[in-house]
């Protein structure tokens, strides 16, 4: 088995601090926080502290936060929950596949939806929306890391923060937002839905009680996510420097490479396409050299292969490699990776 010396894949192991919290929770067990016994009251207090920790990190009020047992369902809750009869839905051609799914479902129900195009930098085109229309606006793209230089103009805004997490909070007003626990190295299966405009939102799922979202989340996972978040925020972050080095190295040392990522985008994502090289072969060569990377679309939908994001940006999809810069990636790892990349590309082009 090849020894991986630097892992640039998007998937990441659970943060050690969160793992310790999770083991403690499973060993201790947990009660129903809605009951009145001592253990339940203690857990309810702990959950409130967790909620306050999330609120502080996300710059929102504790009562605006809802925990989800699956982050993907947050797209339907956050988007469809804002739609009213007659509302139009706007989203972009570089949004996540879950957004496309919600838009398709709404269109099938007779709603007017508009998919906004983007330019070669991934900047969403201008639009005209009424105050009651809903606009999906991603803070940063999950493949390229590119940001939107402009704030959404009008409408009710759903902020997709699943890629950006706490690395970059929205700098615009929004009504609902969705965060994914894995973006701060927390456990999968935890989403954070922020509902700022409670008077303009309603639960779009079938329900017969007053709860805003399904209470199907795992309490130990939510608590572990909070622990991971605190640890993540306390760690040093040199990823902007590392991203700059990678982009400048590729630009100057390897010919015929199209870099989709802007240097001033979200620091943790780099996407580039190497001409005259098959991505899968390059991925395996890099793996043999000790470097794990991703290739193709970050979406999991078979309908969006190999990359609807690059296609929308009119970027080449052949030879595409994606890097995720995690906080434990060192400067030396990046230097070694760049040299290995140059060598692997030269080898494949020669053959």
Model-identified regions with their sequence ranges:
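Pyridoxal 5′-phosphate
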Residues: 1-351
């Amino acid at each position: 088995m090849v020894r991986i010396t630097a892992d640039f894949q998007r998937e990441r192991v659970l943060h050690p601090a969160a793992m310790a919290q999770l083991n403690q929770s499973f060993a201790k067990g947990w009660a129903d926080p809605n009951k009145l016994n001592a253990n339940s009251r203690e857990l309810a207090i702990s959950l409130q502290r967790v909620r306050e920790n999330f609120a502080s990190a996300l710059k929102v009020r504790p009562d605006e936060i809802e925990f989800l047992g699956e982050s993907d369902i947050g797209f339907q809750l956050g988007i469809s929950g804002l739609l009213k009869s007659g509302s139009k839905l706007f989203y972009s051609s570089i949004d996540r596949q879950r957004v496309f799914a919600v838009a398709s479902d709404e269109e099938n129900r007779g709603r007017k939806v508009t998919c906004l195009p983007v330019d070669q930098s991934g900047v969403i085109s201008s639009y005209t929306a009424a105050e009651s229309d809903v606009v999906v606006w991603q803070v940063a793209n999950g493949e390229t890391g590119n940001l939107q230089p402009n704030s959404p103009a009008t409408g009710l805004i759903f902020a997709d923060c699943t890629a950006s997490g706490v690395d970059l909070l929205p700098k615009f007003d929004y009504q609902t937002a969705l965060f994914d626990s894995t973006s701060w190295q927390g456990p999968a299966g935890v989403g954070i839905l922020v509902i700022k405009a409670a008077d303009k939102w309603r639960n779009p799922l079938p329900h017969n009680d007053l709860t805003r979202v399904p209470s199907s989340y795992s309490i130990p996972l939510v608590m572990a996510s909070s622990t991971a978040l605190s640890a993540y925020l306390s760690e040093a972050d040199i990823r902007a420097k590392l991203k700059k080095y990678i982009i400048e190295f590729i630009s100057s040392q390897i010919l015929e490479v199209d870099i989709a990522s802007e240097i001033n985008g979200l620091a943790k994502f780099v996407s580039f396409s190497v001409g005259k090289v098959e991505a899968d072969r390059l991925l395996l060569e890099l793996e043999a050299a000790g470097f794990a990377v991703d290739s193709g679309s970050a979406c999991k939908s078979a309908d969006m292969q190999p990359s609807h994001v690059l296609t929308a940006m009119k970027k080449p999809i052949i030879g595409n490699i994606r890097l995720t810069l995690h906080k434990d990636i060192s400067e030396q790892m990046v230097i070694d990776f760049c040299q290995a990349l140059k060598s692997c590309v030269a080898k494949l082009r020669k053959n």
